[in-house]
């Protein structure tokens, strides 16, 4: 099961970073390259504990849907979203926000399993891990740019 970890320093308070990371609107802006839109559940504003959002996006030329639920929430320190349905076998995405010097260290841990058994593991090694890592890094940079 691959685990992607990212970390970025943002010159903003943890509360600002936390709210930007859970903003449906900022998520859609940051993923415009995949035409990602919220089509179900919470569709705008700040997602809360227990809420779901259904995303529709184009990855690898295929329009897909994925529903995630917020399963842990400790503002402004941490929240977790987990896949309810979608293309992965499963995923858990933990977002952490640590006060550091004149800002916040924003850390992501994206723990996932691909479908299709051995073929999914091969896809992870060949391209999926790097693809997902780039999506997370781009999103984090977008949040950083907006917050600063």
Predicted regions mapped to residue ranges:
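Beta-strand/loop substructures that line and gate deep hydrophobic ligand-binding cavities in soluble
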Residues: 80-134
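Generic structural detector for well-ordered beta-strands
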Residues: 7-11, 38, 56, 69, ...
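Short, surface-exposed coil-to-beta transition loops
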Residues: 3-5, 63-67, 90-93
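Glycine-rich portal/gate segments that line the openings of hydrophobic small-molecule binding cavities
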Residues: 28, 38-85, 105, 138-146
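Short strand-connecting beta-turns/loops that link adjacent beta-strands
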Residues: 13, 75-76, 100-103
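Secondary-structure boundary/capping motif
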Residues: 1-3, 78, 93-95, 136-140
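Hydrophobic ligand-binding cavity/cleft-lining segments
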Residues: 1-44, 48
């Amino acid at each position: 099961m691959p685990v992607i970890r990212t970390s970025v320093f943002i010159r903003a308070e943890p509360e600002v970073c936390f709210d930007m990371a859970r903003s449906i609107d900022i998520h859609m802006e940051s993923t415009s390259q995949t035409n990602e839109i919220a089509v179900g559940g919470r569709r705008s504003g700040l997602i809360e504990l227990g809420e779901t959002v259904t995303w529709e996006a184009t990855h690898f030329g295929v329009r897909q849907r994925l529903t995630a639920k917020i399963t842990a929430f400790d503002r402004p320190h941490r929240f977790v979203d987990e896949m309810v349905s979608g293309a992965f076998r499963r995923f858990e995405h933990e977002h952490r926000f640590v006060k550091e010097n004149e800002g916040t260290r924003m850390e992501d841990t994206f723990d996932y399993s691909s479908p299709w058994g051995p073929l999914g593991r091969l896809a992870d090694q060949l391209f999926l891990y790097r693809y997902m890592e780039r999506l997370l890094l781009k999103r984090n940079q977008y949040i950083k740019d907006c917050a600063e």
